[in-house]
């Protein structure tokens, strides 16, 4: 964490500590002694996107399976950009094994209602035949449903459907309640609990934006993509 919560007031006899030294001091305080439990039990959640494809690898043109519930109102099985782009959403859970098991159960349930279709396992789509081969998600005739569809039509005009069909995994995390008093004590904060927590989360986001590129560089590369994907993006 950095930002205002990471600052150490200088004194006439002691210079301001560097960010690295303060980071090491804070990390040591969180991982040793009575504070070691403070990082355990945070809430975790996963949102996983996967394209429905036919046995030949082409993106499915069929509607979102009715047996999976309404994509507009189902909180755990919905669609993202495309009607074929299923999104599986876990609730926030404390244990990693619970998270993986819930996601596994969702996959098994979905596969029971896909017929001969498959969930494409990689982020980059395959066997793409231009923008027209990617159906935009539909959410019914209600005002909210129509708004969600029109929003996606706008994305198609701005970025193209092929780019929007790239799927991914979102990982959500929140620190456990016991973490915040410990961190506030280490930071010698005089702010209210609410203000301190908000400040700390924004500081974390700033650090993520500063260092997040290395995660994409190391783990976000796709070493191989289908030739149809690149040609569709240049002509779609």
Could you tell me what each predicted segment is?
Residues 173-236:
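Extended, regular secondary-structure scaffolds
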Residues 5-156, 163-167, 196-220:
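Terminal catalytic/cofactor-binding subdomain
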């Amino acid at each position: 964490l950095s930002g205002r919560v990471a600052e150490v007031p200088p004194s006439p006899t002691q210079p301001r500590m560097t960010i690295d030294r303060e980071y090491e001091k804070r990390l040591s305080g969180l991982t040793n002694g009575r504070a070691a439990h403070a990082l355990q039990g945070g809430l975790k959640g996963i949102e996983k996107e996967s394209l429905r494809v036919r046995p030949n690898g082409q993106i499915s043109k069929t509607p979102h399976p009715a047996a999976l519930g309404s994509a507009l109102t189902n909180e755990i099985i919905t669609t993202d950009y495309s009607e074929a782009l299923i999104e599986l959403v876990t609730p926030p859970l404390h244990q990693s094994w619970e998270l993986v098991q819930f996601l596994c159960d969702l996959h098994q349930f979905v596969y029971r209602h896909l017929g001969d279709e498959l969930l494409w396992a990689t982020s980059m789509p395959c066997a793409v035949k231009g923008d027209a081969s990617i159906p935009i998600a539909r959410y019914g005739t209600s005002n909210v449903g129509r708004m969600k569809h029109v929003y996606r039509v706008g994305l198609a005009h701005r970025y193209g459907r092929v780019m929007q069909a790239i799927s991914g995994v979102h990982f959500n995390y929140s620190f456990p309640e016991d973490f915040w008093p410990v961190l506030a004590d280490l930071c010698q904060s005089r702010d209210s609990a609410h203000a301190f927590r908000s400040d700390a989360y924004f500081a974390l986001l700033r650090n993520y934006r500063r260092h997040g590129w290395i995660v994409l560089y190391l783990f976000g590369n796709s070493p191989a993509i289908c030739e149809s994907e690149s040609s569709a993006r240049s002509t779609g």
